Amino acid sequence: LLNALNSGTAIVSYIGHGSPYQLAQERLLDMNRGDINRINTGNKLPIWIVGTCSFGHFDDPISESFAEELIREPMNAASMVISTTRPITVTGNERYTEDLFEAIFFNNSVSESKVGILLQSIKDGTSEAQYFHLLGDPAMQLPIPKDTLVNINISPDTLKTLETGTYTGIQNITNSAGYGYVSLLDADKDITREYDIQSETYSLSYTLPGATLFRGQFSFSDLSISGQIRVPEDISYSTKPAKLLMYINDEQNEARAVINTIQLAGGEATTDNFGPQISFENMNGTRLEADDHLIENDNLIIRISDPLGINLTNEPGHEITITNLNLSNSLIVTDDFLYDQNSITTGKIDFDINDKFIHLKVKAWDNANNPSEKEIKLFRTEENKLKIYNVFNFPNPFKNKTQFSFEVTQDFDLKLDVYSLGGRRIKSIEKFNLPAGFNVLDWNGRDAFENEIANGVYIYRLKAKMVTQLYHILVVVQNINE
């Protein structure tokens, strides 16, 4: 539940037992346990529709209800809460929430009415209707796209494992270029659980969404939309159809589309037995290798690529995992993977880690279920200290040119001075407003007058400068002219 909340959802709906402080006897959410502090939606604020007893008991001067605490969270947790102020019966609860959702999705479309108007439209004078209140701004509209993409098609009509499908459509919300998101979901799963209670056996049946088979981004330059998806081997082979979900937006408008008639089937086997390529980058896109440095407060970018695509189904044993080898604990991060724009082979995970010394192992699977692992050790730099790390030049010795590479902890101005062994400065190179992290600088091996320098050993000094700090380092370079 918390993962779904923090990832972003439009509506949180609950019907069942509860109180002003918790949902369900099993403590699905518990205010006294501090669960509100674990909700981190950011600006992705959902509407809560909670059909349970007294969840929104706002007129109790002695204590605060869960609904009140949710709505008080600054830019977090909830945009509004619709819930009860008193105990409510099961039938009344069910009837009212059913009426509310019928008003929200009137005639199988999303209502354009303000939420306060929707709520008022189903107030029928019954006690159950009187118990439900809106905590929030009644003039707000539903956080669900009203517009739809049109003429959405996918070909072929049956998608086979390890093969690609092409989707097309028309958007009419913007005349400019933009981008959107696309997901392919496996068939819904019918679940039945049996419980033995006091020598009686009870069954509970429900439906869960199918596994995510693809999750990516696409771009468009006009009204037409098109892109590709790839199907993994790990499908359910259900007779039910799969779904394609699409979403686009600009600053003012958003639109969505669903195709829920896609058939999936087994495809041809592959001879590919190589797993994905795994690499690491900083937030500037610079590739990181063992013992490199990551700037303080920067996330680590984990890039994963494979010609057959990456397995995103989260099937047991086929998840994308990150193991913190310092703590010997693992996280399943499959849901954090997103394909690059217009790609069906390469994507990334934006991983937040604050360790001073980073030691991770990443494991991922391609769509043919070939695994790969990659381990890396990194050092975290201190943001308030200007330092230069890992200064090298290559080739060294050099003939006609060489390239200097180095890491700097903060944005900086650079000055490179090259000296003879006698202390004479023969060349200076300056660069300004360079970004923190890994940088390179080329030198053609000539002096300040563009003359070739003599064979021999030289010393260079690298200076990184900020307004208040200066850091420099001396290194030896050798020149060989034939």
What do these predicted ranges mean?
Residues 255, 369-373, 425, 450-452, ...:
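A structural signal for beta-strand boundary/capping segments at domain termini and interdomain linkers
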Residues 377, 384, 451, 455-482:
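C-terminal tail/sorting-segment detector
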Residues 51, 55-156:
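Active-site-proximal C-terminal subdomain of hydrolase catalytic domains
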